Each structure stands twice: as C-alpha cells, then as structure tokens.
C-alpha cells in the first residue's frame, strides 16, 4: 500500500495542541500515521479493533501505547482528557446510529480546545459500494464479510453537528494502489 502523507500539513498544529498530552489515533492499522506522529515528537495512544494490526503497528513503531478497542463501543478515556484525536478511515464500519454515537464519544473525550482530524470514505469513491449486493441503509453496505459506509458532504456535516468545522475538503488519495476519494476534516468542539 502507498504511504499517505496526509498528516504532514497538520503536524505543527498537532504538536502545539498535544504538548503535554497524548494524541489518540483511532484505527492505527499497521502504524503509518502512528510513525509520523511519533517522529514529530507526539505521545501517541494507537488503537485498533484488530490484534493483527496492533501487532504490525508494534513491530513497525515499538515505542507506542497500544489499545485494542472497538470504535463502536464507549471509549475507555476520561471526559475531556485528550487534546488531539486522529481517525483516518476508521469510522465507516457502523450503522448510522452507532456512527452518531461515535461522534458523541469523540466530543466527550476531547478537551474543550482540542482538535479532531478525520477522514471518511466519500460517496464519490471509485470503489463506492464495491463488491456489494446489499445496501443495509443509505450509503452503508455489506461488503464481503464486513460493512462499509460512504459519506457525502451533508453526512460529514451531520456527523460533525455540534462541532466548529475548521477544514473540510474532498480529496483523492491512493489506497491499495488505486485512487480513493475521501473527505478530510479538522474540527473543534463548538462552544
């Protein structure tokens, strides 16, 4: 898979906001973003539902705190305890009700002056609904043995209701050696 340097432009802000605290990375996968965050001097708590992904992350980035967790369940962090949360393509596996509960958990855990950096599958993705025969709910599909949600701009804005959206842009990245359309956002809790 191609390395994706999407965090580079955000690193100065992440460093400033996370000074003295931890960056929570939801869905760390093999640890590419984790490595970038650690190289920038951040203290990272990397999470993933997959023990295999956590093992890969641990091998590639040995000095990181790892937690196996399901993003669809309540997060094991205190209220308003995290200055930065990064969630790159890790919030699209859930029904809409669970997705909105995740948004509430993100707000609960983030400090009042904290930031959320997130990327979501776009409905303009080249592989939108790939290999799917079953739409479970609008823009949410059964894909082989998993589920996958795709977001249009109104869905991203609904997910971020109660947030001050500082940045929202649709981009094309490379994933699995193919183009992939994603929404990228940076948001802060609204007053």
Model-derived segments and spans:
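Surface-exposed loop/turn positions
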Residues: 21, 81, 113-114
């Amino acid at each position: 898979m191609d390395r994706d340097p999407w965090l580079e432009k955000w690193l100065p802000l992440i460093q400033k906001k996370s000074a003295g605290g931890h960056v929570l990375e939801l869905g760390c996968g093999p640890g590419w973003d984790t490595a970038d965050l650690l190289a920038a001097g951040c203290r990272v708590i990397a999470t993933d539902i997959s023990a295999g992904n956590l093992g890969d992350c641990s091998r590639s980035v040995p000095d990181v705190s790892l937690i196996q967790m399901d993003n669809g369940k309540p997060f094991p962090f205190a209220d308003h305890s995290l200055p930065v949360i990064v969630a790159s393509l890790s919030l699209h596996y859930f029904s809409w009700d669970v997705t909105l509960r995740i948004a509430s958990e993100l707000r609960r855990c983030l400090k009042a002056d904290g930031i959320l950096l997130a990327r979501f599958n776009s409905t303009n993705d080249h592989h939108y609904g790939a290999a799917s025969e079953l739409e479970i709910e609008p823009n949410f599909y059964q894909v082989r043995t998993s589920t996958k949600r795709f977001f249009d701009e109104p869905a991203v804005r609904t997910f971020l209701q109660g947030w001050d959206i500082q940045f929202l842009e649709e981009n094309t990245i490379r994933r699995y050696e193919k183009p992939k359309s994603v929404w990228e956002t940076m948001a802060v809790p609204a007053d």
